């Protein structure tokens, strides 16, 4: 097992989209109220006193939609300034990015992932539940102009919706130094659609792209599990995240912290979670919290390998937006 050095921090469970694979309109969700969410100071305390001493020094801010969190740029500035923090990145749906990209960059953020599931505005509306393609595309352009590098676009491939666009989405990397990542559809968030539509193996997508453009090994900076390739001569790269077809538990280097303070060692397994918010608010010393997290790190390999649920059975109590993706 690799060293766990990467934490995904969900800042908010709310979102201004209703993506079919995450938070569909028909989902019955109860939003967290502000007092239930970790405050900026609580997040910084956990990072400074619990995670950094354990060697976890790379952080990704997620949601929900993190750009909905008030004062996000102040949290980013404080997080980036903590001694020992090696990397801070953010994942967003891009809707508010045109207005906020410059502020985020000035706060110290350099790496950003944007969900972008279709080049077709109507298909985009069907997937996200909102008619906001143009605003997101504009946000991508602004983020590129501001200087985010690498700029990554996340594509969840859903049969019958955007599967036919894979080659066109891959072509975005030909003249742009972008990283387009194709993510296998998972059952978390919308099990009914997963059962109905299924998912497409990354290898099938690679074969299609290889047939049209060719494909060679590539590299992009980051901390994720993507297998990286490049179209020969392209400025950008392609990534494939194959959590359904190609188990990468043996190279998992991450944990997830929900916006209400639950630390989760594995995306596909709900066992082993620990609550950090309540003991932190109760004044429990940081050393005791570190020990809890240390013990969770010790058992993470067993949770990854022995408790992994591929979605073929069981159910998930939390949606992707509540977990933090």
From Swiss-Prot:
Query: Top EC class per UniProt?
Result: lyase
Extent of Polar residues compositional bias? 310-325
Could you tell me the superkingdom of the organism this chain comes from?
Bacteria
Q: Which reaction does it catalyse?
A: GTP + AH2 + S-adenosyl-L-methionine = (8S)-3',8-cyclo-7,8-dihydroguanosine 5'-triphosphate + 5'-deoxyadenosine + L-methionine + A + H(+)
Q: Which family does it belong to?
A: Belongs to the radical SAM superfamily. MoaA family.
The record ties this protein, via SUPFAM superfamilies, to: Radical SAM enzymes
Q: How does it assemble?
A: Monomer and homodimer.
Q: Which residues bind S-adenosyl-L-methionine?
A: 21, 64, 115, 186
> Where does this protein hold GTP?
8, 60, 91, 152, 254-256
Where in the sequence is the signal peptide annotated?
none
Q: Cofactor note, please? A: Binds 2 [4Fe-4S] clusters. Binds 1 [4Fe-4S] cluster coordinated with 3 cysteines and an exchangeable S-adenosyl-L-methionine and 1 [4Fe-4S] cluster coordinated with 3 cysteines and the GTP-derived substrate.
Return the PROSITE patterns for the record.
Answer: MOAA_NIFB_PQQE, RADICAL_SAM
Domain (Radical SAM core) ranges = 1-226
Q: Where does [4Fe-4S] cluster 1 bind?
A: 15, 19, 22
Name listed for the protein in its UniProt record: GTP 3',8-cyclase
- Region annotation (Disordered) ranges: 306-325
Q: In which pathway does it act?
A: Cofactor biosynthesis; molybdopterin biosynthesis
Q: Per its database record, what is this protein's job? A: Catalyzes the cyclization of GTP to (8S)-3',8-cyclo-7,8-dihydroguanosine 5'-triphosphate.
Q: Which cofactors must be present for this protein to function?
A: [4Fe-4S] cluster
Q: Which residues bind [4Fe-4S] cluster 2?
A: 249, 252, 266
Keywords in UniProt for this one? 4Fe-4S, GTP-binding, Iron, Iron-sulfur, Lyase, Metal-binding, Molybdenum cofactor biosynthesis, Nucleotide-binding, S-adenosyl-L-methionine
What is the E.C. number?
A: 4.1.99.22
The record's InterPro entries line, in alphabetical order, gives: Aldolase_TIM (IPR013785), Elp3/MiaA/NifB-like_rSAM (IPR006638), MoaA (IPR013483), MoaA_NifB_PqqE_Fe-S-bd_CS (IPR000385), MoaA_twitch (IPR010505), MoCo_biosynth_MoaA/MoaC (IPR050105), rSAM (IPR007197)
Species assigned in the record: Synechococcus sp. (strain JA-2-3B'a(2-13)) (Cyanobacteria bacterium Yellowstone B-Prime)
Q: Name one GO biological process term.
A: Mo-molybdopterin cofactor biosynthetic process
Q: NCBIfam families per the record? A: moaA
| One annotated GO molecular function | cyclic pyranopterin monophosphate synthase activity
